[in-house]
């Protein structure tokens, strides 16, 4: 984006009071966590999503999936929030805005660890667990494998004895109703939407920014490459989260 367009985008952002930040896997890429759909390095280039992210696979044999998600949780805990995460949290705490809300498709906890307090997880979390049958929550013991392992037996529910599952949304499952309702409301109330690090191809999550677009709300996209959401963006910056977000907020004088 040329300098004139950058200054226009900054002027629009400077007048906003209620910010909605919509993030995807690219948000955490600068923290060393893999994205999902990169053909060479993405998560789904290395494992079959139907084997590691479906309720049918869990019902057949939960041990490989439990091992994989426990290892991923450990990797996420080793990662550190990057400058993009930290900038969002800093923006939230500034006196120039009324609110900075985050709606994320990510299942890590880097937004929270950076200091953001208003975070909605559309696809669940690596750090939340529940019984696969009765849904009773299970408290994470923080015991993560240091290296990938092929199988781990999941713990059993203290109430009904069935396996405890990761609190993430698998393919074919509905998004959590409460989180979806919050995300919809925030998109309808925002006066600026900032899209960061998402390909915009995973639905229904990708439909959320359209709600703001239909109201004429300015949308700023920060992502290294053009995406399916670029068409509705008022301004698109070709930058990573760790580059683009600090540059934006620095220009705002926050």
UniProtKB/Swiss-Prot annotation:
Cofactor binding description? Binds 1 zinc ion per subunit.
Q: Which SUPFAM superfamilies match?
A: DHS-like NAD/FAD-binding domain
Q: Name one GO cellular component term.
A: cytoplasm
Q: Domain Deacetylase sirtuin-type, which positions?
A: 1-254
Localization, per the record, is: Cytoplasm
Q: Which UniProt keywords apply?
A: Cytoplasm, Metal-binding, NAD, Transferase, Zinc
In this chain, Zn(2+) is annotated as bound at 131, 134, 157, 160
Please list every transmembrane segment annotated in the UniProt record, as residue ranges.
none
- Function comment: NAD-dependent lysine deacetylase and desuccinylase that specifically removes acetyl and succinyl groups on target proteins. Modulates the activities of several proteins which are inactive in their acylated form.
Full protein name: NAD-dependent protein deacylase 2
Please name the source species.
Answer: Corynebacterium efficiens (strain DSM 44549 / YS-314 / AJ 12310 / JCM 11189 / NBRC 100395)
Q: What high-level taxonomic lineage is stated for the organism?
A: Bacteria, Bacillati, Actinomycetota, Actinomycetes, Mycobacteriales
């Amino acid at each position: 984006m040329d300098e004139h367009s950058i200054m226009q985008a900054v002027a629009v952002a400077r007048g906003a009071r209620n910010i909605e930040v919509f993030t995807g896997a690219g948000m955490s890429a600068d923290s060393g966590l893999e994205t999902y759909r990169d053909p060479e390095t993405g998560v789904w280039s290395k494992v079959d999503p139907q084997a590691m992210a479906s309720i049918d696979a869990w019902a057949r044999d939960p041990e490989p999936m439990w091992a994989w998600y426990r290892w991923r949780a450990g990797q996420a805990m080793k990662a550190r929030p990057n400058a993009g995460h930290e900038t969002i949290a800093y923006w939230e705490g500034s006196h120039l805005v009324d609110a900075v809300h985050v709606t994320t498709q990510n299942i890590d906890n880097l937004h929270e660890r950076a200091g953001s307090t208003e975070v909605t997880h559309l696809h669940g979390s690596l750090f939340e667990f529940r019984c696969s049958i009765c849904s009773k929550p299970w408290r994470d013991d923080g015991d993560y494998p240091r290296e990938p392992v092929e199988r781990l037996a999941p713990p059993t529910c203290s109430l009904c004895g069935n396996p405890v599952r990761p609190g993430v949304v698998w393919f074919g499952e509905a998004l959590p109703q409460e989180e979806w309702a919050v995300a919809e409301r925030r998109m309808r109330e925002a006066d600026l939407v900032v899209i960061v690090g998402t390909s915009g191809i995973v639905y229904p999550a990708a439909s959320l920014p359209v709600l703001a677009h239909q109201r004429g709300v300015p949308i700023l996209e920060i992502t290294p490459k053009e995406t399916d959401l670029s068409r509705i963006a008022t301004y698109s910056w070709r930058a990573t989260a760790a580059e683009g977000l600090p540059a934006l907020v620095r220009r705002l004088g926050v």
